[in-house]
Amino acid sequence: MSDVAERVKKIVVDHLGVEESKVTENASFIDDLGADSLDTVELVMAFEEEFGCEIPDDAAEKILTVKDAIDFIKANAAA
């Protein structure tokens, strides 16, 4: 697993308080991990801070799973 994936999963575990074993790449933030809309906004902000990238609102709306976040960050992050 890549460093980006590990960092994304750690942020998800820390922000949502879920078990690390539940944070798989195909896990939906809302359906599988119990996030609400505020949680997803906070996750996006945490990803921006951790990886030094900006995630525009239209892109953030498409980040529904852990893999979506990893793929976006790999394509756009400075770190």
From Swiss-Prot:
UniProt GO molecular function: acyl binding; acyl carrier activity
Keywords annotated in UniProt: Cytoplasm, Fatty acid biosynthesis, Fatty acid metabolism, Lipid biosynthesis, Lipid metabolism, Phosphopantetheine, Phosphoprotein
Transmembrane regions listed in the UniProt entry: none
Keyword Lipid biosynthesis recorded: yes
Record PTM O-(pantetheine 4'-phosphoryl)serine, positions in chain: S37
UniProt GO cellular component terms: cytosol; membrane
Metabolic or biological pathway: Lipid metabolism; fatty acid biosynthesis
Modifications after synthesis and translation: 4'-phosphopantetheine is transferred from CoA to a specific serine of apo-ACP by AcpS. This modification is essential for activity because fatty acids are bound in thioester linkage to the sulfhydryl of the prosthetic group.
Subcellular location, record wording: Cytoplasm
Superkingdom, natural source: Bacteria
Gene Ontology annotations of biological process type: lipid A biosynthetic process
InterPro entries linked: ACP, ACP-like_sf, PP-bd_ACP, Ppantetheine_attach_site
Family membership: Belongs to the acyl carrier protein (ACP) family.
NCBIfam families according to UniProt: acyl_carrier (TIGR00517), PRK00982.1-2 (NF002148), PRK00982.1-3 (NF002149), PRK00982.1-4 (NF002150), PRK00982.1-5 (NF002151)
Protein name: Acyl carrier protein
